[in-house]
Amino acid sequence: MSEKMKDQREGGFLIAKIHQITNRMFTQMLKDYGLEEVNPGQGRILFALWQEDDIPIRELSRKTQLTKSTLTTMLKRLEAAGFLTRNSDEDDERITKVKLSVKSKNLQKKFVEVSKMMTEVFYGTFTEEEIDRFEGYLRRILDNLIKTK
């Protein structure tokens, strides 16, 4: 490969394009399964809370890689829609904790099903070995980006 070609790598462009198309498809799949109240970005927050509920916003920010200001805006919308509550920590009122509502817990099974379907579309003809290798490369890219922040 020539030096000129190496300077014009398309990894970032391809990742952005994949994100855009995946987001559009996932939004449609959520709608098709009656989950139109939740968009993929909000699903990312709910998914993190399904893994560990009743956690401080700071921890949720770390898990989702969303800034606190972006997360706060999204949490307000999710709270207004009845998916979660935000309350001060009993031991330290400076800490705001996020807790899932029954409504969001009831969505979990359907949301996970749609996520699995999206994963099947996403990886299509990949072998397990290719998926493992690909995800390893993505983790390295993510680590590189986090280190440079």
Q: Where do the language-model regions lie?
A:
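C-terminal regulatory/oligomerization modules of transcriptional regulators
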Residues: 1-6, 128-149
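N-terminal positioning helix adjacent to the helix-turn-helix/winged-helix DNA-binding module
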Residues: 7, 11, 41-42, 103, ...
